[in-house]
């Protein structure tokens, strides 16, 4: 089975004395749903960011979607194929309205305005978010923002999803709704979560990051 994302010997440190990642090897195959576990501050978010080029490792190689990725131009393509759901929805949503936030990715991928509009409608309908289409994004609740963030990621039709604490700080109805949505998606996933139910219901494999090493 070929990997969608494959890390080889990845190391990174924000200061020389304390490596966050130390020779990490990791592979995500098609259809896999991998839980990335570890204590707060262990480097889980850093590892997700390495996968999509938001952080460049000091050593090691990043292979994604068939080839090694090194330059920013390489990772622009990766970020279109591996949708990263940020831990804080406010880091992801920056357009005035929900429709504009969801259309942003497809437009950047070269879709016409008409095509992007169709994608927005289809994606919001699919997630049950059509009533939010013309809402001002910053006025939404935290749970609504989280769902709109997922819609913005899915609108790019990624092959993989990298989910950073997807259910964090959600009320129970929104949390359950999000889990149902994720359970029905076909994409491979890496899920960072401390939510035991999310892990038990969604993942096919678990790995743990501790002291810079992945086991």
List PLM regions with ranges.
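Conserved ABC transporter NBD signature motif
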Residues: 60-70, 78
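The feature captures the beta-strand-to-loop junction immediately N-terminal to the Walker
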Residues: 37-39
